[in-house]
Amino acid sequence: MGSFATAVQSRLRERLAALRPRFDWETEHHVAATPVDIAGRADSHVALVELEWRRADPADNTAKLFRHLDEEALAADVVDVFQLFTGYYDLASGGVSSKRLNAEFVGRVGTQALDSFRYRAVDFALDPPQRGGDRPKDWEGVADTTAREIGEYL
């Protein structure tokens, strides 16, 4: 992961910790063998945040998480999975790419199959820079807005 992605991940964790202090938030949490960008735990409630920058197959992340949760790799009564999608998944003609649609489909199916699990796709209103490119000037505000959206859901 690049330094910008790490900075965004840290900013989101810090904002979530301020907004929802009852959760113990950490970055790079593992669910079985799958690393999750940000995770928070409050008693028997777990929140998982996966940030999709420009992954070729974001549905794979969703499927792996729900597979591990189905195998009870994470003991919790309620698990909220938030999958954040950057502008990379937006189509110039409007709408979103099939990559994102597939990930959202897997999330919906996982939620229907597993009673204690909830999935939410979240727009992360940022176009990630190419490797070595400049960070968008408003990235901190975007991270803060996204953290508030997640916090309101929790």
Give, region by region, the residue ranges found by the protein language model.
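Acidic-basic catalytic patches of nuclease active cores, encompassing PD-(D/E)XK
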Residues: 1-29, 154
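Hydrophobic/aromatic beta-strand patches that form the interior of the parallel beta-sheet core
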Residues: 47-49, 82, 120-122
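Catalytic cores of nucleic-acid endonucleases
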Residues: 54-110
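Conserved catalytic cores of phosphodiester-cleaving nucleases, focusing on short active-site segments
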Residues: 38-40, 44-55, 68
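Short, conserved, surface-exposed binding loops centered on an aromatic residue
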Residues: 30, 39-41, 75
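Domain-level recognition of nuclease-like catalytic cores that cleave nucleotide substrates
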Residues: 88-154
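Charged, terminal alpha-helix-loop-beta segments
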Residues: 22, 28-31, 111, 121
